[in-house]
């Protein structure tokens, strides 16, 4: 891809995200979302592979539909209340349409079918952008309108996303699809708590972004796109594979790693809100995700394929962790002891 085109797309992505998360007016927020969509399309299709072109078309169709719904819901609200302010969403039909539009943009169940397919057609770095940066503007809109939205509907979306995200990830062999279903499952946790404690949703999203970035960057360094490749990469890059394993266990929410903190805090908050049955259900459903994280961890470090060499480590030029990956790995695995400090900052 032309460096100038890549620079323009990157700047547009940052600008679109900034416009949406800092705006109070629906038209400005919608403009930021459209800039984001137009900026990411060249990055998805840059390989010119048929699968990448297919992923681009799917992404464009779903995002344009969701953006049109957001614009329509804001117009309906403005027509009935005379307000274009994002926080003044009072019309019930507008609230319902906005919830559907954000669910499509985020890839929540039952509007999730486009997300794994688009990630599968993208490169690992573009998939990282789709899983993290592109989720930020819709989540910001949800945070700003969370007090107006239907809590029962959000809970239903959250439970179904955690269930389907874990269930459909069980039989996948492509790492990008597994991480796509992981994203859907994590979004379920965020949406579950958004009406009760928005700050906790922000914390969960930040920690999810850190952990997912570590996995994607590590996989991009060792060029792993499927489980069979991950299986044989241990002999070439044991350090990076160990990094992937620890981060995956952190994503699964196992103590004493960072990923345990948001799940623990969400369960605690749900219990305080007298929603113990919901907390129990979402915790049990997260065991499905735990299974495929453990499967990935098993393939990355715990098992070795049949091989003719007597040595576990093949001779290769050492691939060292680059600085961003090293910092993200440290944050992905060691933040749990700092949880009291983080809780006081919420």
UniProtKB/Swiss-Prot annotation:
Enzyme class: translocase
Alphabetical keyword list: Electron transport, Membrane, Mitochondrion, Mitochondrion inner membrane, NAD, Respiratory chain, Translocase, Transmembrane, Transmembrane helix, Transport, Ubiquinone
Gene Ontology CC terms: mitochondrial inner membrane; respiratory chain complex I
Sequence intervals crossing the membrane: 25-45, 52-72, 95-115, 124-144, 149-169, 178-198, 200-220, 242-262, 274-294, 326-346
EC number: 7.1.1.2
Pfam families: NADH_dehy_S2_C (PF06444), Proton_antipo_M (PF00361)
GO process annotations (BP): mitochondrial electron transport, NADH to ubiquinone; mitochondrial respiratory chain complex I assembly
Its membrane topology: Multi-pass membrane protein
Localization terms from the record: Mitochondrion inner membrane
Highest taxon, organism lineage: Eukaryota
Reactions catalysed according to its record: a ubiquinone + NADH + 5 H(+)(in) = a ubiquinol + NAD(+) + 4 H(+)(out)
InterPro entries in UniProt: Complex_I_Subunit_2, NADH_DH_su2_C, NADH_UbQ_OxRdtase_chain2, ND/Mrp_TM
MF terms (GO), sorted A to Z: NADH dehydrogenase (ubiquinone) activity
Protein family (similarity comment): Belongs to the complex I subunit 2 family.
Biological function: Core subunit of the mitochondrial membrane respiratory chain NADH dehydrogenase (Complex I) which catalyzes electron transfer from NADH through the respiratory chain, using ubiquinone as an electron acceptor. Essential for the catalytic activity and assembly of complex I.
Quaternary organization: Core subunit of respiratory chain NADH dehydrogenase (Complex I) which is composed of 45 different subunits.
PANTHER family: NADH-UBIQUINONE OXIDOREDUCTASE CHAIN 2
Protein name: NADH-ubiquinone oxidoreductase chain 2
Organism, as annotated: Gallus gallus (Chicken)
